[in-house]
Structure formats: C-alpha cells, structure tokens
Amino acid sequence: MITDFQVYIALMAALLASVLAIRLGATLYQ
C-alpha cells in the first residue's frame, strides 16, 4: 500500500534529482 506521504517523498526525490542533473549538465557545458 502506497501512502500519500510516500508519494510526496518520491516526487520530492525526483525533483531534486532532476535539479541536480540540470546543474551538473550546465556545469559540464561550461
């Protein structure tokens, strides 16, 4: 059973991962 809290944590983790990936990509392109 998946709770709303687990969904919230998963969404925040995905958002953080995407932000880190974008920042890493921008750094490499410089």
Swiss-Prot record:
Native organism: Thalassiosira pseudonana
Subcellular compartments: Plastid, Chloroplast thylakoid membrane
Membrane association type: Single-pass membrane protein
Protein name: Photosystem I reaction center subunit XII
Keywords: Chloroplast, Membrane, Photosynthesis, Photosystem I, Plastid, Thylakoid, Transmembrane, Transmembrane helix
GO biological process: photosynthesis
Domain of life: Eukaryota
Family annotation (InterPro entries): PSI_PsaM, PSI_PsaM_sf
Main location: plastid
Keyword Thylakoid set for record: yes
A Pfam family: PsaM
Keyword Thylakoid in annotation: yes
GO annotation, cellular component aspect: chloroplast thylakoid membrane; photosystem I
